[in-house]
Design a protein with these regions (language model features):
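Membrane-interface micro-motifs in multi-pass membrane enzymes
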Residues: 31-38, 93-97, 147-161, 199-201, ...
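Transmembrane-embedded, aromatic-rich helix segments that form part
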Residues: 36-41, 200-212, 337-342
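Transmembrane alpha-helices of multi-pass inner-membrane enzymes
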Residues: 42-46, 344, 370-419
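A membrane-periplasm/extracellular boundary helix in multi-pass inner-membrane enzymes
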Residues: 196, 217-263, 278-286, 294
Length: 419
């Protein structure tokens, strides 16, 4: 009987480790792969809840989780409140929103499994970044991407996976040389694929990642180190600008967009985004409590174009998205939406920040990974509705749940956070 019990728990841990190993790669390689892995992990969590393996601990509530749980349900609640006000109960907005609260059972499962389950992530992040790099092709204008994702999402996913690869070095102790090389290659592949995609909005996160690295990884910052770092950064940018035709082209396009915008041409990529941001603020100021509905921003475009507030081209593109996650939720669901999307970022960010104060090096490093991950998605969402895609919402909520579960794992031998 004991052998059967042991096999059940072992099977659960092996299944969870396998899903953690493959989910980043399936995001690129298989359309719907991320949602498929999410569903399988959720089913595994439900199975364990229904029939808990003997020897596996029950869930022990910690008061820090309350903010995280509320944040994961906030978007769905904001959507429902806005829909009640507008008497429009379309189910579509709840699709992506459901991924947040459905990640809670995943968190509760993983935080009770042994830590070696999470070791799979050390391979998952770099392998996915390298896979995406190898799958990339040049479909339009020399910008590289894949068929299962648009260029912006592809470039941003590659960048975050590359950064996670770099930040995971020595995560569970000193890495062996082959694993360290794999992680460095993952970082290089992710950065190269992001640059080749031309997703310049995501590049805004690079200074943030550098700041996180220096804050947590460098114990002593001298004036000499700062000077050397600045010179190195300028040199690196110059080399990339000269060597990468895509990077060169996208930077020149941005400069041209700004110059022509000052001359009155608002229908550039940058100009249209700026118009839509102002339009979203305008909508929010007129509907501050409940917004215009989760998908009501599109209906505001024609009246605003007729009033001369935005150009017809901006209105046409605005029917698709606002190009900003925060402004989109604020315009669509008012104050409830604004608070909900901020909670999606800052509730887990706060827990990861607390994790960096832990007595355990593993928890500290996991907290740093979480901070880098959430910060990256926050910046990505400033120039595109990154979390509007169901698979992107699934990837974000799933990864946050996984990293938080590693932080709060019951098998750590040291107290989680210093008092």
């Amino acid at each position: 009987m004991g052998m059967v019990q042991s096999r059940y728990l072992s099977l659960v841990e092996k299944a969870a480790a396998l899903l953690l190993l493959i989910y980043p790669t399936l995001t690129f390689a298989v359309k719907g792969g991320m949602n498929g892995v999410f569903l399988l992990m959720l089913l595994l969590a439900i199975a364990v809840w229904a029939v808990r393996p003997p020897g596996m601990n029950t869930v022990k509530w910690q008061h820090e989780w309350k903010a995280y749980f509320l944040a994961m349900g906030a978007i769905a609640a904001a959507i429902f409140i806005s829909q009640i006000y507008h008497q429009n109960y379309d189910a579509h907005p709840h699709d992506a929103a459901s991924r947040y609260w459905l990640a809670i059972p995943v968190f509760l499962l993983l935080q009770r499994l042994r830590l070696n389950v999470f070791a799979a992530l050390q391979f998952a992040f770099p392998v996915a970044a390298i896979t995406g790099f190898l799958l990339a092709r040049n479909p339009v204008g020399g910008r590289s991407g894949i068929g299962t994702l648009d260029l912006i999402h592809f470039g941003n996913f590659e960048l975050i996976l590359g950064v996670l690869s770099l930040f995971s070095i020595d995560w569970f102790g000193r890495d062996h040389l082959p694993l360290r090389i794999l992680k460095i290659l993952g970082f290089a592949a992710g950065l190269a694929a992001s640059l080749a995609s031309g997703s310049r909005g995501g590049w805004l996160a690079i200074p943030v990642f550098i700041a996180i690295f220096f804050y947590f990884k460098v114990t002593r910052v001298s004036l000499k180190m700062v000077a050397v770092s600045l010179v190195s950064a300028i040199l690196a940018i110059t080399i990339v600008y000269s060597a990468s035709s895509t990077f060169h082209q996208r930077v020149n396009e941005l400069a041209n967009d700004v110059a022509t915008f000052d001359q009155g041409n608002r229908d550039t990529s940058t100009g249209i985004r700026w118009q839509l941001y102002k339009a979203a603020v305008d909508v929010f100021m007129r509907h501050p409590v409940f917004g215009v509905g989760p998908e009501g921003f599109a209906a505001e475009m024609k009246p605003m174009a007729d009033a001369g507030k935005i150009t017809p081209k901006a209105a046409e593109l605005g029917r698709g998205e606002v190009h900003n996650d925060i402004l989109s939720k604020a315009a669509g669901m008012g104050m409830f939406g604004l608070l909900a999307i901020l909670a999606i970022y800052f509730a887990p960010l706060n827990l990861f920040w607390r994790a960096t104060r832990s007595a355990s090096e593993k928890i500290k490093r996991t907290g740093i990974l979480g901070i880098a991950f959430v910060s990256g998605f926050f910046v990505f969402g400033l120039t595109v509705e990154f979390l509007n895609l169901t698979m992107a919402a699934a990837f974000y909520s799933f990864t946050v749940a996984v990293l938080l579960a590693a932080c709060y794992n019951i098998h750590h031998g040291e107290p989680f956070i210093k008092p």
